[in-house]
A protein has these predicted regions:
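Active-site-proximal alpha-helix that buttresses catalytic centers in soluble enzyme cores
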Residues: 1-342
Length: 342
């Protein structure tokens, strides 16, 4: 019995060039889960965005890239390899084959499923690697996978499908977060820990608050597991895409507000991402870090009820890297897969 596991993440362009970014961005934005406007309107909007936006983002991709390629893709490939090793080392009568797929770009969901078909897998586990169940992302992954599986049915392959919608409540994931934060940051009096998640449309949350509830629960667990006062661990959301109503408060504004209130030590962790990407690396660890470190912090002492500016002291900023290949994360993924197929 061979169980196929598809580890699915959002994706990345093939290269940090305008020529590579345009088709990637177009595929991303044309997904009705991302932009729900009727097709003709969506196509017109996307055509306009794609004609302009890559010129503004290509420098960020170039800054994120390394000579070896996309760090996000490299980490994702390692995760798939480690998960396959972990699954097979803990299995007596099953063989697991893990493939990596991206919802947008390469390697595609279609190519991943074809690889599992050729391996004659008897069951398929779809595992979008979003710890919290964000419908826009995971839902789109499931829909695309089932669309491609429908095509493969014509070749006589119709295995049972197991969908994993979240794994934020698996203890191994919680423990991995605790260890990761503790490794990179130590709380001192006056510190604040900002727990930042990818934002999503407020209209989606009103229909189904599962994602928001799981983000809140994760923030609460982090505070409890680290023994921090709840008021020192702040929930926020990053990377809103346009002018529509998005889930807030926004991370950048939260950090600015903390500086205005005299906080001089800020740590940001992004538990919703299992691999560092352009959002975490550029928006948070570069741009937000530069803002914090180049804005004079305020003293904890106040004058007349207002924090006093100390030009000789600047705020410190810590970014906790994504879990990546952390053994605790791999164990959480292994447990999620075995639970789904037991």
């Amino acid at each position: 019995m061979t169980i196929g596991v598809m580890l699915i993440n959002t994706g990345t362009p093939n290269a940090p060039t305008i020529e590579a970014i345009k088709p990637y961005l177009s595929e991303f934005l044309m997904d009705p889960y991302i932009m729900g406007a009727p097709y003709p309107i969506r196509k017109a909007i996307v055509s306009h965005i794609v004609s302009k936006r890559p010129e503004h983002t290509v420098e960020n991709y170039r800054a994120f890239w390394t000579p070896a390629g996309s760090p996000f893709l490299h980490t994702s490939e390692q995760q798939a390899h480690l998960l396959q090793e972990a699954l097979n080392s803990n299995s007596d009568n099953r063989t697991y084959r893990v493939v990596l797929a991206m919802r947008y770009g390469n390697p595609s969901i279609s190519s991943g499923l074809e690889a599992l078909r050729q391996e004659k897998c008897t069951d398929i586990v779809l595992l979008p690697v979003y710890p919290q169940n964000v419908k826009v992302c995971a839902g789109s992954c499931f829909k695309e996978a089932r669309k491609q599986l429908k095509k493969l049915e014509k070749q006589g392959w119709k295995p049972p499908i197991h969908e994993i919608r979240s794994f934020h409540d698996i203890p191994a994931y919680r423990n991995a977060l605790k260890e990761q934060i503790s490794q990179y940051w130590t709380c001192v009096p006056g510190s604040k820990l900002v727990v930042s998640f990818h934002s999503t449309l407020l209209s989606d949350i009103k229909k189904d608050p599962t994602y928001l509830n799981q983000c809140r629960q994760t923030r609460e667990w982090i505070a409890n597991d680290l023994g921090l006062p709840s008021q020192d661990v702040i929930l926020s959301f990053q990377s809103r895409f346009d002018s529509r109503a998005w889930l807030s408060p926004f991370t950048e504004q939260v950090v600015k507000d903390q500086l205005d209130q005299g906080i001089s030590d800020i740590c940001v962790v992004c538990p919703g991402f299992v691999a560092d990407n352009i959002e975490t690396t550029i928006e948070i660890n570069r741009d937000l870090r530069n803002y914090v470190e180049n804005v004079s912090a305020f003293c904890s002492e106040s004058k007349g009820g207002k924090a006093a500016l100390n030009p000789n002291r600047r705020a410190t900023f810590t970014y906790v890297p994504a879990l990546g290949c952390n053994p605790g994360l791999i164990e959480a993924l292994r447990i999620a897969v075995t639970n789904a197929t037991d």
